Amino acid sequence: ARKARIKEMMAEVLLPTDDEYLERYPHQLSGGQQQRVGLAMAFACRPSVIVLDEPTTGLDVSTQEHVLKTIRQLTRDHGVAALYITHDLAVIADLADDVAVMYSGRVVEQGEVSEIFKNPAHTETRHLVAAAPDIASKKSIVGLAGRAQSPGKRPVGCAFA
């Protein structure tokens, strides 16, 4: 039953299910294959919520799209809610319904993705949106000035006030 479940999950993330492939070590897999094995492991437990911390970091654009498509399909097929932790606004715009923007360990703005990106209310959100590359426009990318606050030296209240 265990081996059958492993093969079932590997097939769901579009990886080979033959015994030779299942015997491979992580270093014998590409980054995208490693991500999909991680997804198979996570969904094998039949969770109601899955936390994805930077699920596409270090992947090329085509592999990134394939991994995100796989995540989208798995969450729909299994009725699983997904919590994405990412700095990649393109991922959020593509996959999320709602977003919470954090700064220095605190949620500074939250709401529907379309509204937050169209009308960002908080300074940090405006900075993030302005810093995101936009292939459709010719605007220059705006860098984020400064450094993140150290956890033990966070200001009281809003750092932007």
List PLM regions with ranges.
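Short catalytic/signature loops enriched in Gly
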Residues: 19-20, 112-161
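Conserved ABC ATPase "signature" region
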Residues: 3-20, 129-130
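A short, surface-exposed alpha-helical micro-motif characterized by mixed small hydrophobic
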Residues: 92-94
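Conserved ABC ATPase signature
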Residues: 25-29, 33
